[in-house]
Amino acid sequence: MKNNKDTRVVVGMSGGVDSSVAALLLKQQGYDVVGIFMKNWDDTDEFGVCTATEDFDDVVRVCNQLEIPYYSVNFEKQYWDKVFTYFLDEYKAGRTPNPDVMCNKEIKFKAFLDHALALGADYLATGHYAQVRRDKNGRVEMLRGNDENKDQTYFLNQLSEDVLDKVMFPLGHLPKSEVRKIAKEHELVTAEKKDSTGICFIGERNFKEFLSEYLPAQPGEMQTLDGIVKGSHDGLMYYTLGQRQGLGIGGSGDPWFVVGKNLTDNILYVGQGYENDYLYSNALVATDINWIQPDKISDTFNCTAKFRYRQQDSEVNVTIKSENEVYVAFKEDQRAITPGQAVVFYDGEVCLGGGTIDTIIKNDHKLDYVG
């Protein structure tokens, strides 16, 4: 085992407070720390300002404060090919993708990890709120971050055990408030910087406008599942299951929600009431399955699952259909399960892995109106 001072750790630095504190903590622990900034997207805004330039300037300032070397690496082509193309393809298919999951799988913990290892790094560290633990046999597990509100294992569900063996999450045991406090105590220039929100390549821009630049919108009818026309939609890709905002349906009674999509006829299905029965299901089929420790997964088992970020866990039964497909039965009916989103499985604090929601099931029947 190497001493810390002989162990090189490349820190993926975004210019935010989390990655800044991750680098600080590793430096304090005596590691040979190198900061690297990834440029994944040409994000010049409407005023000609490139936010990536501002973020890199913050990385430079923090690295100078910490007295560690820093570099920048460009993954724009890989990001376009592996993440953005997938993002557009999913929307074309009427689904609601999660680009953060794909970015972690293909860019941060693949292209970037390979780059770090090529630089002689022993580990790649990031500011994610998750934890890596070795069990008594030396096997690597991923645990939730201690800060329940910030835990990011949902977005890291596609990482393999081999990848996690080369990864450090220095913030995993800390609450966010403590991370801010550490940054202020050490007067890091990013201490007061607000957290980035939304999809990285959209930034603060209007989602509808952004998407329409790449996919032509096809307006069509809004109908109930009984065929009653309630208005028109701007394009199916702009709507997701359970959505209430932006439907423009007036009148009295309960509010209206998106309950499904018909891609063939370009119809957006709507239903009245938050508890609308059409929004509920009791099972799903997921594909693109990744198990962090696949040899420990049995053919059928009980665990908990999340169907969206920051959702409470739900009890489920998982049946393996093939290497790339699972059937997930819910103990209690779930509302607005959305194709394209991630389903992530847990055994207590341990993240088992996850997949992409493909098909929604109710009483043993596929819900065709979901898309």
Curated annotation (Swiss-Prot):
GO terms for biological process: tRNA wobble position uridine thiolation. Keywords: ATP-binding, Cytoplasm, Disulfide bond, Nucleotide-binding, RNA-binding, Transferase, tRNA processing, tRNA-binding. It catalyses: S-sulfanyl-L-cysteinyl-[protein] + uridine(34) in tRNA + AH2 + ATP = 2-thiouridine(34) in tRNA + L-cysteinyl-[protein] + A + AMP + diphosphate + H(+). Its EC number is 2.8.1.13. InterPro entries: MnmA-like, MnmA-like_C, MnmA-like_central, MnmA-like_central_sf, Rossmann-like_a/b/a_fold. One of its GO terms (cellular component) is cytoplasm. GO terms for molecular function: ATP binding; tRNA binding; tRNA-uridine 2-sulfurtransferase activity. ATP binds at G12, M13, S14, G15, G16, V17, D18, S19, M38, G127. The active site is at C103 (nucleophile), C200 (cysteine persulfide intermediate). Disulfide bonds join C103-C200. It is an enzyme of class 2 (transferase). Residues 150-152, 308-309 are annotated as: Interaction with tRNA. The record marks H128, Q341 as: Interaction with tRNA. It comes from the Bacteria. It is found in: Cytoplasm. Residues 98-100 are annotated as: Interaction with target base in tRNA. Its main location: cytoplasm. Catalyzes the 2-thiolation of uridine at the wobble position (U34) of tRNA, leading to the formation of s(2)U34. Belongs to the MnmA/TRMU family. This is tRNA-specific 2-thiouridylase MnmA. The lineage of its organism: Bacteria, Bacillati, Bacillota, Bacilli, Bacillales. The gene is mnmA.
